[in-house]
UniProtKB/Swiss-Prot annotation:
Residues 200-220 are annotated as: Disordered. Pfam families: Flavodoxin_2. It comes from Streptomyces coelicolor (strain ATCC BAA-471 / A3(2) / M145). This is FMN-dependent NADH:quinone oxidoreductase. InterPro entries: Flavodoxin_fold (IPR003680), Flavoprotein-like_sf (IPR029039), FMN-dep_NADH:Q_OxRdtase_AzoR1 (IPR050104), NADH:quinone_OxRdtase_FMN_depd (IPR023048). Binds 1 FMN per subunit. The gene is azoR. The lineage of its organism: Bacteria, Bacillati, Actinomycetota, Actinomycetes, Kitasatosporales.
């Protein structure tokens, strides 16, 4: 049975969050295609992962027999997250832009799962896992826009998820999400609506495509 690791990090509830809305569309389609499958869900806003500590960090590079009690406890929490990453056949991440980068809760999760010699290094343990990131943002930071150089979500996640963890990464980017609430952006409402519709369509399409891909891979 296929396993989906679904991570949300928006501080807003589903009805007020662009990223949650799109990840929900992906997940609904995924569950329709995998009625017997498993979903591991992490809502990092509701139940934050602890930020990395010296004990949690150093324990990852210490001989298990030599870890202190505090190191062992801290590493156990990391290990749970690492094993969820490794179990996943597909990973889905909601990553809204906050102050030009990812939410701190998502950064905390990444700091926990990135372990040199296991999930990172010469042979990352989750290498090749299909990963879809919904990178919503209030404005537009696309190439050619005035704030192109302020884009630190996709650039950062490319470095961590693709280059370091070796994941097979794709982005869905709902943009201009502040347009309905910001009168100064009223002229951009049609572009926002188009972006929202496209993002939901892409989520459904990608969920179906990944189902076909997994089916083909399992049939080999």
């Amino acid at each position: 049975m296929a396993t989906l690791l679904h991570i949300d990090s928006s501080v807003f509830p589903a009805e007020a969050s662009a990223s949650r809305s799109v990840t929900a569309a992906f997940r609904r389609t995924w569950e329709e295609q995998h009625p017997e499958g498993t979903v591991i869900y992490r809502d990092l806003a509701a139940v934050p992962v602890p930020h990395i500590t010296a004990d949690a960090w150093s324990a990852g590079y210490a001989d298990p027999s030599e870890r202190s009690t505090r190191q062992s406890a801290a590493f156990a929490a990391r290990l749970e997250l690492i094993e969820e990453l490794e179990r996943a056949d597909v990973i889905l991440i909601g990553a809204p832009m906050y102050n030009y980068t990812v939410p701190s809760t998502l950064k905390a999760w990444l700091d926990s799962v990135l372990l040199l010699g296991r999930t990172a290094g010469e042979a990352p343990s989750a290498q090749g896992t299909p990963t879809v990131v919904v990178a919503s943002r209030g404005g537009s930071y696309a190439p050619g826009t005035p704030r192109e150089d302020f884009e630190f979500v996709q650039n950062y996640l490319e470095a961590v998820l693709r280059s370091t963890l070796g994941l097979d990464l794709e982005f869905i980017v709902p943009e201009l999400t502040m347009a309905p609430r910001n009168p100064a952006m009223s002229e951009l409402l049609p572009l926002f609506e188009s972006s929202r519709e496209r993002a939901h369509s892409e989520a459904v399409t990608k969920a179906k495509e990944l189902t076909e891909r997994l089916t083909a891979d399992n049939g080999r």
